[in-house]
């Protein structure tokens, strides 16, 4: 053994080829500070051993290296620029040491080689991947750019255009695609991986592979004619801005770094990259996006723990077909759990099956699936008009019309057809789980399971715990949601649960603006372009459906009359009363037509303005900051109330619910991250300016106390 540490072992193979194996103590290899220090020490040992003629990098795990240890980032990025620069330069010195070894080097890539893992293989001369490999630089998803030489070496290996696409889109690449552009040199079966990499090193040693020319190319300025460079970078900037926009600076920073470093050698280019990396690391956007990544891991970790208490779900059922039922059936069947789709009407069953088939057909057309896989998924869905079909189900998801009496009747019927230990869940968005539980003989096996529409696209599922729901019930439904490929958050029962409870104060803030004469299209523009929502409140209400919005608003007003009760009509009432239901009947706040691709296209409709002005008078202009404050303060305060009341268990789950459930702008990180970034004291001072508008704008005593103590919701 040439070198051994808790994360890396180096041994000498035949023909004086050294094998450096990444083998961290956890389930995967990551680049934390310990591993970088171990790699540095291992390379020193390798350099000192004069018998070594070549080096092979491998992994003892099922993946190569998944990237940097993100958990270290938030504390690391709190340090001053000089300390952070020293850390980046120290890490880069290690990668340079690997690249500068006096003999050929190769990487045998199994599974994921992402971020720092990808930068590691780029520092070697030769790269062989197995058929399961995935290679990429995902840093821009975290608001960063690669910091260990990714923007320097990748363009010199695969060309500027390909490298910019890889870096700015942050997508994992399949091995065949990586081979096509020259990022790797061969793709082999997993069982042949190490042998193929060793053979490549032999080819380098005997002169049939010019490893030194490959290395020199990586260490030299980018070979790109001036005119071609101008066109390449101008095109990349245009494409990046159209996709990322102004709120996500990392992709554009990556283009600028590659451009600025194009004429420099490796060491000069690495300095450009390091300075840009540090600048981005200090941004609120990076803090927010890294926070989302860590929150996602936290929520999924909780779901994994719940899995230990969960019962197996081998057969599921959904009651109520149609679009929602079809979406749930598709999601279950596509992830391997057969499901019965039960309804009382054949046309509804056909609609549900058509919904599943439509999703699958689109996937096949886009090359994301095959006709064989489509057939397998559809065969996993059994439509039925008979309750007898659900008798062997381990879980039944009720998804009938959103009406308490109808749901209660259906739930009582279901209990008579399933086994004693089958779990029953209601896909309701507003109806109290405790109320619905009264219709069951065994309420302990019942909870809420709130899917968001469209089911196949929306990652969140709210699992609602009723006062009688058992831990096994909650754990099983959480595990089933995870198995379906969803991110579950567990919330306690209250009107609107979590997501709708905090969404409707936002709509109330919007309605208040319109009642004072604000232009709904102007409000949408500010909330989309400046705050960063994917849709402004008027557009979102049209998409949700103003009938749905009107119903949910009434539920919220009844549940929280002090804050959400209304005096007189608001804009939602006016649209609903005039049968303007949104996209579903082509007219809401906006008018809708179908574009060439068959998608809804919105247009300004004068009738909406006439209806609103008849009630609220002439239009009046509002400042952008005023619009944002009027809409966001109610949502933020209500979200904090949910944490204080125990509706949600943690800021992390609250923020993930908002980002995944209603599209809260990821670059802001969620309400709690937004509050911490803004400063709780600053928010309280802002809210106090609007407190005269009513309870929705009045902060809680606990918020005021936190502000006075200069506290935060996330602990550093």
UniProtKB/Swiss-Prot annotation:
Annotated active site: 450 (for 3-hydroxyacyl-coa dehydrogenase activity)
Molecular functions per Gene Ontology: 3-hydroxybutyryl-CoA epimerase activity; delta(3)-delta(2)-enoyl-CoA isomerase activity; enoyl-CoA hydratase activity; long-chain-3-hydroxyacyl-CoA dehydrogenase activity; NAD+ binding
Protein's pathway: Lipid metabolism; fatty acid beta-oxidation
Region (3-hydroxyacyl-CoA dehydrogenase): 311-716
Site (Important for catalytic activity): 119, 139
Reaction(s) this enzyme catalyzes, per UniProt: a (3S)-3-hydroxyacyl-CoA + NAD(+) = a 3-oxoacyl-CoA + NADH + H(+); a (3S)-3-hydroxyacyl-CoA = a (2E)-enoyl-CoA + H2O; a 4-saturated-(3S)-3-hydroxyacyl-CoA = a (3E)-enoyl-CoA + H2O; (3S)-3-hydroxybutanoyl-CoA = (3R)-3-hydroxybutanoyl-CoA
Chain residues that bind substrate: 296, 500, 660
InterPro entries in alphabetical order: 3-OHacyl-CoA_DH_CS (IPR006180), 3-OHacyl-CoA_DH_NAD-bd (IPR006176), 3HC_DH_C (IPR006108), 6-PGluconate_DH-like_C_sf (IPR008927), ClpP/crotonase-like_dom_sf (IPR029045), Enoyl-CoA_hydra/iso (IPR001753), FA_oxidation_alpha_subunit (IPR050136), FadB (IPR012799)
The keyword Phosphoprotein is annotated on this UniProt entry: no
UniProt region (Enoyl-CoA hydratase/isomerase), positions on chain: 1-189
Known partners and oligomeric status: Heterotetramer of two alpha chains (FadB) and two beta chains (FadA).
Protein name as catalogued: Fatty acid oxidation complex subunit alpha
Species this chain originates from: Shewanella frigidimarina (strain NCIMB 400)
The encoding gene: fadB
């Amino acid at each position: 053994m040439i070198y051994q540490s808790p994360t890396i072992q180096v041994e000498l193979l035949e023909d004086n080829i050294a094998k450096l194996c990444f083998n961290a103590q956890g389930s995967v290899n990551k680049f934390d500070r310990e591993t970088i220090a171990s790699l540095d020490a291992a390379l020193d040992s390798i350099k000192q051993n004069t018998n070594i003629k070549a080096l092979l990098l491998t992994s003892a795990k099922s993946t190569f290296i998944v990237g940097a240890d993100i958990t270290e980032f938030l504390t690391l990025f709190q340090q001053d620029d000089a300390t952070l620069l020293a850390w980046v330069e120290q890490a880069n010195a290690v990668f340079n040491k690997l690249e500068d070894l006096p003999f050929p080097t190769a990487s045998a890539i199994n599974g994921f080689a992402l971020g720092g893992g990808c930068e590691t293989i780029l520092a070697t001369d030769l790269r062989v991947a197995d058929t399961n490999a995935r290679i990429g630089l995902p840093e821009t998803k975290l608001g960063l750019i690669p910091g260990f030489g990714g923007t320097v070496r990748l363009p010199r290996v695969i060309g500027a255009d390909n490298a910019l696409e890889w870096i700015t889109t942050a997508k994992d690449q399949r091995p065949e695609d990586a081979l096509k552009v020259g990022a790797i040199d061969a793709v082999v079966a997993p069982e042949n991986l190490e042998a193929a990499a060793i053979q490549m090193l032999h080819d380098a040693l005997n002169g049939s592979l010019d490893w030194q020319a490959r290395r020199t190319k990586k260490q030299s300025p980018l070979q790109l004619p001036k005119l071609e460079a101008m066109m390449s970078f101008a095109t990349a900037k245009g494409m990046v801005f159209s996709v990322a926009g102004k709120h996500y600076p990392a992709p554009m920073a990556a283009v600028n770094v590659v451009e600025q470093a194009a004429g420099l050698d490796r060491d000069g280019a690495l300095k450009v990259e390091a300075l840009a990396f540090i600048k981005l690391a200090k941004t609120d956007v990076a803090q927010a996006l890294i926070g989302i990544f860590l929150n996602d891991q936290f929520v999924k970790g909780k779901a994994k723990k719940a899995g230990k208490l969960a019962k197996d779900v081998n057969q599921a059922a959904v009651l109520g077909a149609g679009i929602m039922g079809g979406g749930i059936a598709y999601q279950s069947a596509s992830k391997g759990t057969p499901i019965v789709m039960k309804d009382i009407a054949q046309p509804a069953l056909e609609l549900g099956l058509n919904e599943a088939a439509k999703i699958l057909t689109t996937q096949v057309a886009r090359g994301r699936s095959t006709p064989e896989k489509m057939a397998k998924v559809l065969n996993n869905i059994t439509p039925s008009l008979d309750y007898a079909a659900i008798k062997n189900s381990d879980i039944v998801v009720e998804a009938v019309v959103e009406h308490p009496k109808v749901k209660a009747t259906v739930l009582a019927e279901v209990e008579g057809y399933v086994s004693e230990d089958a779990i029953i869940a209601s896909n309701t968005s507003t109806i109290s789980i405790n109320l619905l539980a009264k219709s069951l003989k065994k309420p302990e096996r019942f909870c809420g399971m709130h899917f968001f529409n469209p089911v196949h696209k929306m990652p969140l599922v709210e699992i609602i715990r009723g006062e009688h729901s058992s831990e096994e019930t909650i754990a099983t439904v959480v595990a089933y949601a995870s198995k379906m490929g969803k991110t579950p958050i567990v919330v306690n029962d209250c009107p609107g649960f979590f997501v709708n409870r905090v969404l409707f104060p936002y709509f109330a803030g919007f309605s208040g603006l319109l009642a004072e004469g604000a232009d709904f299209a102007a409000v949408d523009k500010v909330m989309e372009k400046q705050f960063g929502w994917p849709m402004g409140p008027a557009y979102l209400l049209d998409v949700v459906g103003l009938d749905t919005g009107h119903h949910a608003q009434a539920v919220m007003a009844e549940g929280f009359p002090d804050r959400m009760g209304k005096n007189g009509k608001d804009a939602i009432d006016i649209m609903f009363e005039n049968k303007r239901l949104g996209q579903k009947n082509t007219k809401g706040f906006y008018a809708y037509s179908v574009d060439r691709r068959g998608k809804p296209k919105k247009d300004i409709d004068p009738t909406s303005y006439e209806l609103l002005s008849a009630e609220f008078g002439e239009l009046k202009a509002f400042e952008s900051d005023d619009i944002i404050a009027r809409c966001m303060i109610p949502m933020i305060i209500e979200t904090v109330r949910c944490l204080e009341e125990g509706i949600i268990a943690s800021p992390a789950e609250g923020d993930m619910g908002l980002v995944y459930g209603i599209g809260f702008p990821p670059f802001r990180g969620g309400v709690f991250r937004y509050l911490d970034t803004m400063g709780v004291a600053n928010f309280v001072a802002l809210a106090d300016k609007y407190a005269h508008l009513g309870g929705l704008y009045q902060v809680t005593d606990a918020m005021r106390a936190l502000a006075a103590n200069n506290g935060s919701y996330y602990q550093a």
